Each structure stands twice: as structure tokens, then as C-alpha cells.
Regions:
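Flavin (FAD/FMN)-binding glycine-rich loop and adjacent Rossmann-like elements that form
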Residues: 1-199
């Protein structure tokens, strides 16, 4: 989910402990923070972009954040019930993460205090308990046709004469899998590459 929160006390609903909350889901975040020692949430914990009216657009930031890595594999080909369960699991994870950051005593105090400034906005998504109803599904299908666009197109090493569209954003893929390799946790799939013009 891309998250809209607010730090306006008059418009804020506190982030509360979600039903079925399990702090062990966030053990890796604690391990990461112990090593990385972020100075603030925007320091590779949450990507907090300020919006008008004391609100945010929050996105994934760092190796353990709002992306529920690896839990979406069955979404593209899943039936409605499978997709519904995946979305419910993602919602549970996301709300649990926000609560964990603000309330778990093992989190550094400065990050807990910063998180507690934020809450769900009373005036947003009033028909969905003030939480965005739209999951942040970046991509689930790739069209395979007579021509398949690749990194070579993005970096202008290969062009086509009969283009039907244009893109102007970086190559930006979030992690899609979490593995244990030689006793160490590894995320796989993150691509952040820019520095080129529209393609």
C-alpha cells in the first residue's frame, strides 16, 4: 500500500494494535536497524513524502519496509478468494508494521517517537476505516509479443521505429523474494537505475 497518514492532531486517528498482531513478523527489521542505525524513519525505514495538509505519501524504503516481500507470488494467477486473502495478509502486515515501529520497546526511542506523530487521517478513505483501499500492485504481468521491451530500450541501446508509447521513469523494481543464503538473509529483485532520458 502507498500510505496516507497525517501528523495533524485535529485530524489524526492513532495507529492501534491490529487484530492478530505478531511482533515476530518484524524481527528482521530489528536486526537491520541494529546494524544500520537509521537516524530517522526516512533513513531507509519508510519513504515519507510530505503532501499538502500535513499528510503523507509513504512508500517502501530499504530492505525491510512496507513491501511484504515474497507474499504476492500467487496473486497474478490466483482466483478471487486467493487474491482476497493475499490482500488481507498485506493489510495485516502493513498495519502491524506501523504499529510495531511506534510501539515495540525494542525499536529505538527516536524512531518510535517519530512514528507516534503519525496517524490515519479522519478525512481520508472514510468508507474504508481511514486506510487506503488500493493495494500498491506494481506489476503482475509481462506482455510477450512480437517485440519485448528490455533494459536495452530503457537505456537507448535499442530503439524501435513504430513505438506506441513512451516512458520517462527510472528502472524501478522492488524486491520480489527473500532468501536465506549461507545463513544470511538476502532480498532479490531490487533494481533502481536511472540517469537516462525518456524511452
Amino acid at each position: 500500500y502507498r500510505l496516507c497518514l497525517t501528523n495533524d492532531p485535529a485530524n489524526k486517528i492513532d495507529i492501534t494494535r491490529p487484530a492478530g498482531y505478531d511482533s515476530s513478523m518484524f524481527e528482521l527489521l530489528l536486526r537491520y536497524i541494529a546494524v544500520f542505525k537509521p537516524k530517522e524513519l526516512n533513513d531507509r525505514v519508510l519513504k515519507i513524502d510530505n503532501m499538502p495538509n500535513h499528510k503523507t505519501d509513504i512508500n517502501n524504503n530499504g530492505p525491510f519496509s512496507t513491501d511484504y516481500i515474497g507474499m504476492n507470488w500467487n496473486y497474478p494467477d490466483g482466483d478471487y478468494n486467493t487474491r482476497k486473502q493475499i490482500l488481507a495478509d498485506q493489510l495485516h502486515y502493513t498495519k502491524g508494521l506501523l504499529y510495531f515501529i511506534g510501539h515495540d520497546p525494542r525499536m529505538p526511542e527516536h524512531l518510535r517517537k517519530e512514528m507516534l506523530q503519525w496517524g490515519y487521517p479522519k478525512d481520508e478513505y472514510t468508507d474504508n476505516n481511514n486506510f487506503t483501499p488500493q493495494a500498491y500492485i506494481r506489476e503482475s504481468r509481462r506482455m510477450i509479443g512480437a517485440y519485448v521491451m528490455t533494459q536495452n530500450n530503457c537505456e537507448a541501446r535499442e530503439t524501435v521505429a513504430d513505438a506506441v508509447g513512451m516512458a520517462a521513469y527510472t528502472m524501478d523494481s522492488h524486491n520480489c523474494e527473500r532468501l536465506v543464503v549461507n545463513g544470511m538473509v538476502k532480498n532479490e529483485g531490487d533494481v533502481q537505475k536511472g540517469g537516462f532520458g525518456p524511452y
